[in-house]
Regions:
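Internal glycine-rich alpha/beta core junctions
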Residues: 7, 35-186
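Long, non-coiled-coil amphipathic alpha-helical linker/lever segments
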Residues: 1-34, 94-107, 188-193
Length: 259
């Protein structure tokens, strides 16, 4: 599910990157106008990050694909390793090389922290869209359906509720990752302090992130990109956005940077 969701989102981002590779806009650092970029470049950065997320998720899936049937404390006191290998093989799992009563929970922590990083990537895209949709910026906006209400009290508004929702889910998944990290340390060969946690975070984190990926993909697919507003904002500071070129020319002539 998650890999399919990443693939759909990456495909949508790639379309926008290619469509707007020549759409100029102002780049911002610290929220302040910096130098020109293109909207396609911004999307290309998202695309590359999602590719890294996909590779990490595949690696995390492999990391967690282990099981154990080696007895109460992992000693094979009443079982044979061959039996464990056969049964786990049928389930598509590998035998845990050195188990206790359970598979060590560092494997699970890697999986959930990977989900948290993926959630952070989704939040990065969603947060950018939210910023670009602000009235003072107006360079892009999430889709707004016919008959959709922007605000119960202020009907003129078009709030970025879809991307806000994605940002909220990312926070939730990060919290689940922290819970998974807390599960690594168990008493001796096992206690069950991890069990109640995993019963919640395993389905919730996976399903919440699947939903966020689908929602964000829909937003990117139907994203309202506004090149005219980008051009207006790009010219807001006049030629000041090319100040670095002036600075470098002066430095080459011997003027100190702090002058």
């Amino acid at each position: 599910l998650l890999l399919t969701g990443i693939d759909r989102l990456r495909a949508a981002v790639r379309v926008q990157a290619e469509r707007h590779k020549h759409t100029p806009m102002i780049g911002r650092t610290h929220g302040i106008h910096a130098e020109p970029i293109t909207f396609g470049l911004k999307c290309a950065s998202w695309y590359a990050e999602l590719g890294r997320d996909r590779r990490r998720l595949v690696a995390a899936r492999d990391e967690i694909a282990f099981g154990k049937l080696s007895g109460a404390v992992g000693t094979f006191a009443n079982n044979e390793p061959a039996i464990e290998a056969t049964i786990l093989g049928r389930l598509g799992l590998h035998p845990e090389p050195i188990a206790t009563q359970v598979v060590p929970r560092d494997r699970h922590a890697v999986y959930f922290t990977t989900l948290a990083v993926l959630g952070g990537s989704c939040e990065r895209i969603a947060l950018e869209i939210r910023h670009l949709q602000r009235t003072e910026v107006g360079e892009a906006a999430e889709p707004f359906g016919k008959g959709q209400k922007g605000s119960s009290a202020m009907p003129h508004k078009r709030n970025p509720i879809l991307t806000e929702n994605v940002c909220g889910i990312a926070r939730l998944v990060r919290g689940y990752a922290m819970a998974a990290l807390e599960n690594i340390a168990l008493w001796h060969e096992r206690d069950i302090s991890h069990s109640s946690v995993e019963r919640v975070i395993a389905p919730d984190a996976t399903l919440a992130l699947d939903f966020a990926l689908a929602r964000l993909a829909g937003v990117v697919e139907e994203l309202d990109v506004r090149p005219a507003a980008m051009a207006t904002n790009l010219s807001r500071l006049g030629g000041a956005i090319f100040s670095e070129q002036v600075l470098l020319a002066l430095v080459r002539k011997g003027v100190a940077r702090d002058q």
